[in-house]
């Protein structure tokens, strides 16, 4: 059966009953969206602050491949397995974006027998959070152009506006546009463009805010552009935009509660990409889960060089979170791909390619242990085409590396197939928990922070940038030098070349552009050819998605 067929056969339980029975959340503290989705009230969350925190487990992966690694599937499977062995566990995930759903991925709610449900709702509109983020973002865009049209009292330089528009879709045609065409009645003629919603600073702010007051303050700090002197910033609060933006987000800030196929609880909230944003679910969701459960399993997007680095250096730094251990997801197929095998040949046994691709896993393990300071368990996500010889070789190689590796079959068997992984992780978390370290210190310059990530985590020889980028970073050091850096880089490689597989080293990371996300509280460094508005592939997943006369959706996976 396909993922969606498995999900549609799930026996879901009313979310209000599950929340009360498993986590003790009273019905009055939930805002239900139908029978199987609910938002958790902020006043209830505020009342949890004196409870002790549970233990936080981060799931990440080797560098992604077209073969798929199964990070979300592993997060769900591990959470289900921990509950099966008697550990009270909640999973924390990001909300899927419509762009990839209709583009390449076709969905992002786990897979096989390790999924969160209702799968179709989660993958499509869910509770409307992304819509709210997009509208709040575009309200600010409209207010900027409206202010300029009505006299421009703030002296905003139309050539130095930093705030693009957003839409939750992969649409390359919108990367660069012209607005205000058709005469003066339609506003000031200028260049503009669209980013995807998950790259919006409003999304990052929603994911890092700890309260409604913090949300509003961060929204007000957004720098939309500069005055005609080219130096003086114009803030969203100068346009009196932040109050209305916060009003649009008043429900979006509440975490969403759903269930797995095995009727365990998961919080799905926020959804920044890890290649063009910071790649983590909301701080509110994670902190809430830590107060409600003994164990919290969360994931960070793409490979450990992107999502996990940002989880540590941005999310943990800002929110004071302390992960106890990291699970690194790997597959035999993906490692063979990193070893040079074509996608169509990945189901054939190839120990030589497996050995060549192992360098990718080895570097990620090194980064997690040496640079993030955390114990690591390798979860080998089992595929039916994996041979016994390949599995045995990989297990032995991990043992030689000094890292525990566990074969997990949660895709096929659900939580039962990940019980060995759950016991291994729980043993480390209970008896040998780690204490994370940051890759760089707050006091380092912005240039040095970028360089440190590139050399330590990516294996680069150094970084490069033109004079304009260097001057901009230098100018920001005075007021924003303490900010962490959010790298925007291809997820497919340690380098900026998506075709450089394995563990390339000695390369140069070229920084093409830098952006100041003042409301979020970090600086974005865009490396290589990375785009903040993706495009659709030649054959988008949308071509295979349909709905029948009874409203039953097909084609999501």
Curated annotation (Swiss-Prot):
It is an enzyme of class 6 (ligase). The keyword ATP-binding applies. Its EC number is 6.3.4.3. CDD domains: FTHFS. It catalyses: (6S)-5,6,7,8-tetrahydrofolate + formate + ATP = (6R)-10-formyltetrahydrofolate + ADP + phosphate. GO terms for molecular function: ATP binding; formate-tetrahydrofolate ligase activity. Keywords: ATP-binding, Ligase, Nucleotide-binding, One-carbon metabolism. ATP binds at residues 65-72. Pathway: One-carbon metabolism; tetrahydrofolate interconversion. The keyword Acyltransferase does not apply. It comes from the Bacteria. NCBIfam families: PRK13505.1. Belongs to the formate--tetrahydrofolate ligase family. This is Formate--tetrahydrofolate ligase. It comes from Methylococcus capsulatus (strain ATCC 33009 / NCIMB 11132 / Bath).
């Amino acid at each position: 059966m396909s993922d969606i067929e498995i999900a549609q056969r799930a026996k879901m339980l009313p979310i209000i009953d599950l929340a009360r029975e498993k986590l003790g959340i009273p019905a009055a503290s939930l805002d239900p969206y139908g029978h199987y989705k609910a938002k958790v009230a902020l006043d209830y969350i505020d009342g949890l602050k004196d409870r002790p925190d549970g233990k936080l487990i981060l799931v990440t992966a080797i560098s992604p491949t077209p073969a798929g690694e199964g990070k979300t599937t592993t997060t769900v499977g591990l959470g289900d397995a921990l509950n099966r062995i008697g550990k009270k566990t909640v999973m924390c995930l990001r909300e899927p974006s419509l762009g990839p759903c209709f583009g390449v991925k076709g969905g992002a709610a786990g897979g096989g027998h390790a999924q969160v449900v209702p799968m179709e709702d989660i993958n499509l509109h869910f509770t409307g959070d992304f819509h709210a983020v997009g509208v709040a973002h575009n309200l600010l865009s409209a207010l900027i152009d409206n202010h300029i049209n009505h006299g421009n009292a703030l002296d905003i330089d139309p050539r130095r506006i930093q705030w693009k528009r957003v839409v939750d879709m992969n649409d390359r045609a919108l990367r660069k546009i012209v607005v205000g065409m058709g005469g003066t009645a339609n506003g000031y003629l200028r260049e503009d463009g669209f980013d995807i919603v998950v790259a919006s600073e409003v999304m990052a702010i929603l994911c890092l805010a700890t309260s409604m007051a913090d949300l509003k303050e961060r929204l007000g700090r957004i720098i939309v552009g500069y005055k005609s002197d080219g130096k003086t910033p114009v803030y969203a609060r100068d346009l009196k935009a932040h109050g209305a933006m916060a009003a649009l987000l008043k429900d979006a800030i509440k975490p969403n509660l759903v269930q797995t196929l095995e009727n365990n609880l998961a919080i799905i909230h926020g959804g920044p990409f890890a290649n063009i944003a910071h790649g983590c679910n909301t701080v509110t969701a994670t902190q809430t889960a830590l107060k409600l459960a003994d164990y919290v399993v969360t994931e960070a997007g793409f490979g450990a060089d992107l999502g996990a680095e940002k989880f540590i250096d941005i999310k943990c730094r800002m929110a004071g979170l302390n992960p106890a251990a990291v699970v690194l997801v790997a597959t035999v197929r993906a490692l063979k791909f990193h070893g040079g095998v074509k996608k169509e040949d990945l189901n054939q046994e190839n120990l030589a390619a497996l050995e060549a691709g192992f360098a990718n896993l080895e570097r990620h393990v090194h980064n997690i242990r040496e640079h993030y300071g955390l114990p690591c368990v390798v979860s080998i996500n089992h595929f039916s085409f994996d041979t016994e010889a390949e599995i045995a070789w990989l297990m032995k190689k991990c043992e030689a590396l000094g890292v525990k590796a566990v074969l997990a079959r949660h895709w096929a068997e659900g939580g039962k197939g990940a019980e060995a992984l759950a016991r291994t992780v729980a043993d480390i978390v209970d008896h040998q928990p780690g204490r994370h370290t940051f890759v760089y210190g707050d006091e380092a310059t912005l240039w040095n922070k970028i360089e440190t990530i590139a050399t330590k985590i990516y294996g680069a020889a150094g970084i490069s940038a033109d004079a304009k980028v260097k001057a901009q970073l230098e100018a920001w050091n005075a007021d924003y030098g303490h900010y962490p850096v959010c790298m925007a880089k291809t997820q497919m490689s340690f380098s900026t070349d998506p075709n450089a597989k394995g563990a390339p080293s000695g390369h140069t990371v070229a920084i093409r552009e830098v952006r100041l996300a003042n409301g979020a509280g970090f600086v974005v460094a865009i490396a290589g050819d990375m785009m903040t508005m993706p495009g659709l592939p030649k054959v988008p997943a949308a071509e295979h998605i349909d709905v029948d006369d009874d409203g039953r959706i097909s084609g999501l996976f």
